């Protein structure tokens, strides 16, 4: 994964920037780029369907255009991209940045975690509605093919999830060119419609949208549910900042993605103005019949790319949450040596697949799925706006009035969309919200339980001098070996070392007490990753620093010490780690009891520390203890 710090050194004429811009098209814009497949159709259906009048068509198009301008172009491209955590973007990175520098930690963390949990909830729907809406184009090709839509969509998604463990580096190289061709195609198709009915360009005037919104009462409010679908992928513009940097994302948005989307939505509006039927997918009706099948194939590929971006994003966010201590350790597999972002987390992959397939089978069509789509991502955007306001005021040092005016505009827009989407709660919106609440609860319970264990494990600090005196008095034998004792907190002598000497009456002549320190920044500078100090008598104290985007690998880190001339043999190291068995006894309240039981379940199913830190199993010695909570 390229670092933003390096990307920003390139200017617009640099080939690296052009290459990154092309790659960004394949990762960042999949969701927002495939929204034309279902957005305008959904808006017209919410407005009453049938044959809409000019006011409805122009008002709908105007609302879509200005939603893309305010949310995507202004909020995310112009503001959010400028607030990064050492080059990384996204709501968890923003939460970590603010909680590190400011005092309102509980509130910031609560908002950030809820936003992240909502992204998981939304991530189950995006692949389902995207792929389903693309395959539904077959119904226009031949009505008899409608019976094959669901099986084809299910087959595509099962295949997509099944290949994740193999990595997608090879086919991923084609994502950028394919999405570039996709945007050019939808832009040209839309332009054809605009040329045939140029009056539709007047929809760029926001008056059309505002008049339609405020003159139609409840209908104008409900229609915002459909309008919002055009911006559901906007959060990815910020979340993928660390992959590409600010310049490539801005260049591709304003240079290709944004104008192509505008032309396509206007083209669909022009088609409906001419009297096209709204019963079928309006997007496909823009295409000449001879090219319909190639467009269906291209649309399907584009939605697969959009789904891949969602899956990859879920893996990345899960790793961030693990490193920040909000989720238990899970097995992370690096699927490619070419990029650090190429990872696979099996549990996340299969749970996401089951949820996505369940939604497709349960709802059966993109039209029905639209009822469940939008509520979670609109809530996420609301959370981002809250954190954005804090960042403008506290980090940029804007006065509270200026910060309030800017963030207030975004807040009004986001809150309006969220309120409108709440009306879909009983029609399916409860699904992503329920998933988000479950995930948020899991993160809270894990973090709370982990802190409880840390308190229970708190031992009286034993100094190095007193430890050396005790082993000298007891006649402990020193052997010519190297031992590494892993600990999660800084202390002179960890309990595992005391227990080892007490039980075995022997100690290696080279002892490294290694504290694993997870930072609230994405990447640790190479020079700061390992700090080591010799305290005497063959005992070293070391601190291994890892950012929340990094995967700890202790043997690789210790190889650096060996290369620097330290007298250790990496092949002759024994690693000592603690292994806690947690059990619940005599909980005062029923709720407290079940929360503790859930934590114990998560703890028992977490990836063993030795696997997570890539320790060679034949060289690991676990020291167990029981802890009651």
Curated annotation (Swiss-Prot):
Catalytic reaction annotation: K(+)(in) + H(+)(in) = K(+)(out) + H(+)(out)
InterPro entries noted in UniProt: K+_transporter, K_trans_C, K_trans_N, Kup
Keywords, alphabetical: Cell inner membrane, Cell membrane, Ion transport, Membrane, Potassium, Potassium transport, Symport, Transmembrane, Transmembrane helix, Transport
One cellular-component annotation, GO: plasma membrane
Domain of life where this protein originates: Bacteria
Coiled-coil annotated spans: none
Keyword match Membrane: yes
Membrane topology, record value: Multi-pass membrane protein
Signal peptide: none
Main location (coarse class): membrane
Subcellular location, record wording: Cell inner membrane
UniProt GO molecular function: potassium ion transmembrane transporter activity; symporter activity
Transmembrane segment boundaries: 20-40, 54-74, 106-126, 143-163, 171-191, 212-232, 253-273, 291-311, 343-363, 372-392, 400-420, 425-445
Recorded family membership: Belongs to the HAK/KUP transporter (TC 2.A.72) family.
Function: Transport of potassium into the cell. Likely operates as a K(+):H(+) symporter.
The protein's name in its UniProt record: Probable potassium transport system protein Kup 3
